[in-house]
C-alpha cells in the first residue's frame, strides 16, 4: 500500500499473514513500511499460538491463544483509537494535514480464552514508548515548561466476561 503523512512523506507498506493452512496452531503476521521523507523503516511483527486446532484464524470461537507483538511506527495521537489499521485505504485519506505525530515502540503480550458456556478471560501486558515527531512536543507542566523527550508507559489489563446463551454469526468462505 502507498500512503502519506507529515512525518513519513510518501510511505510504502507491505504486509503479510499466515493462516491455519500453514499450521493450525502457529500464526504469524506483520508489515514493513518505509517513509521517503524521514528515511526510516517502520515495522510490526506478531506471533500467536492457539492452544486449540484452528480451521483458518486464531480468533475463531472458542478462542484460546497467547500472542506477542512488537511494533515501531509513526502515529498520530488519534490512531490508537481507530478500530482498523491506520494504513487502511479509507483512513489514510485526510482532509487536513496532521502534523503532530510520534514514533511509537510498543511491545504487547496478550492471552485470551473463551468457553462454550459463555465465560471468557482476556489478559494483556504492554510496554510503550512515545517519542514526539513532526510538530508535536511533550511539555512538562512546570514553571520552566520543560520539553520531555519521550513518554514511556506500562499497562496491565484483565477482562472477565460471562455471556451465557450468546450466539455468533459468521461468514464461511471456501479458501
Q: Which residues does each PLM region occupy?
A:
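Short loop/turn motifs that connect adjacent beta-strands in outer-membrane beta-barrel proteins
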Residues: 22-26, 52-64, 117-123, 166-174
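Feature captures outer-membrane beta-barrel proteins of Gram-negative bacteria and organelles
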Residues: 12-20, 36-58, 67-69, 109-113, ...
Amino acid at each position: 500500500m502507498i500512503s502519506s503523512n507529515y512525518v513519513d512523506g510518501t510511505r510504502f507498506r507491505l504486509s503479510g499473514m499466515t493462516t491455519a493452512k500453514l499450521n493450525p496452531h502457529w500464526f504469524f503476521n506483520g508489515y514493513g513500511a518505509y517513509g521517503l521523507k524521514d528515511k526510516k523503516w517502520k515495522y510490526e511483527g506478531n506471533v500467536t499460538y492457539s492452544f486449540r486446532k484452528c480451521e483458518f484464524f486464531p480468533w475463531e470461537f472458542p478462542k484460546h491463544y497467547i500472542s506477542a507483538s512488537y511494533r515501531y511506527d509513526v502515529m498520530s495521537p488519534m490512531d490508537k483509537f481507530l478500530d482498523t489499521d491506520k494504513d487502511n485505504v479509507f483512513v489514510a485519506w485526510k482532509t487536513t494535514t496532521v502534523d503532530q505525530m510520534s514514533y511509537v515502540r510498543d511491545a504487547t503480550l496478550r492471552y485470551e480464552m473463551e468457553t462454550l458456556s459463555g465465560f471468557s478471560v482476556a489478559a494483556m501486558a504492554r510496554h510503550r514508548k512515545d517519542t514526539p515527531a513532526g510538530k508535536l512536543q511533550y511539555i512538562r507542566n512546570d514553571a520552566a515548561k520543560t520539553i520531555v523527550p519521550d513518554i514511556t508507559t506500562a499497562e496491565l489489563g484483565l477482562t472477565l466476561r460471562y455471556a451465557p446463551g450468546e450466539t455468533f454469526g459468521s461468514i464461511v468462505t471456501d479458501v
